[in-house]
Amino acid sequence: PEKDPNFVKFGFYNDLRKILTSKMFYPVFITGLSGNGKTYGSQQLCAHLKRECITVPITIETDESDLLGDKTLIDGNVVFSQGPVVDAMERGAVLILDEVDLASNKIMCLQSIIDGKGVYLKKDNRFVKPAPGFTVIATANTKGKGSDDGRFIGTNVMNEAFLERF
């Protein structure tokens, strides 16, 4: 992302900077009210550190094909077109899963990735191991428990096993 000269460091910035500077795999789950800068702050930190950052907006419709890739038709040939998660893994980039609490259980395909183990792409018959520097930041308005007060309609209760990986 492009560096914003007007960006002001706040909140989680210094802790996240230590994690991203180390280039170790350390998945981070950032929660907070809308408009608090969870995603933008993470993107600006990547810009400051000159780290490649791939942001994936998550919705209720997001599935394995959107994240990992799918077969597609190009010039009459069926080829595998890899998704943004695989791109980030192979390039050692920072992957931001934006608004992850809007997702359905279809994002469970990310469990082995969030464990730092890589992923088998069954549609491409290959295993992808994360390159050095790859890590995951997930942002959410809730703590994965849904929204009881109705402020964040559309958020979901997330799988506990998924949440424990952060």
Show the residue positions of the predicted features.
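AAA+ P-loop NTPase catalytic core and its hallmark functional loops
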Residues: 1-166
